[in-house]
């Protein structure tokens, strides 16, 4: 196997084309773990962009193949042989979401006294708190815990572990996180130690891992992944929750909200809150 030279692939175009390409990436059999984002770049021009960061030659070729099928302008550049993502994010400002203050080491000297301060360093795992989906989850969770506490919490697609760590730091007795990406699991474990949070993380696809099933059922499930996995996991998430339990769904675009909601409402869930941030949506639903 040859070493892969890190690349960034950027595709720009109309919203419908960018969203269709993103759906195609999600459904491509060779791109299950591909890292990409989709966002609105210029509202006046109706311009959207996809940023993709392949890690292998196969991912690189697969992404280019998918993007070539849509009327998007695709450019690419070679990234420096360095921890380029950490370098790009190291200067990010802290994020405030309700009672939560998410920061990096560069902001350690200006922490508010009245917040739950969570140190999450920039890196390859998703979930520094800056993305609209993660902020939406934190905002929804902050509102929920004003009324009640959640003793047992599951975080599906944990990334940096931020959401499970936030739960552990605000009174959850059990906080379990899963991710399909092994480096993310390692990073989330490190973040739990740094934040002195009693949260456990495992490498798992779906909800079948023994650590997940042994601690079920849960009072609260976070699922900050993508729209199609959210739909396919609807029944498993229902099974993992106690009757009356809560799920916070994120990782979906506003345009995908209706179909994701339908998968849960058809199983008896009730929508109790919605949060929109940028192009992203978060749904809070209660199990019957």
Swiss-Prot record:
This is Ribosomal protein L11 methyltransferase. Keywords: Cytoplasm, Methyltransferase, S-adenosyl-L-methionine, Transferase. The keyword Cytoplasm applies. Pfam families: PrmA (PF06325). S-adenosyl-L-methionine binds at residues 134, 157, 179, 224. Its main location: cytoplasm. GO terms for molecular function: protein-lysine N-methyltransferase activity. GO terms for cellular component: cytoplasm. The lineage of its organism: Bacteria, Pseudomonadati, Pseudomonadota, Alphaproteobacteria, Caulobacterales. It is an enzyme of class 2 (transferase).
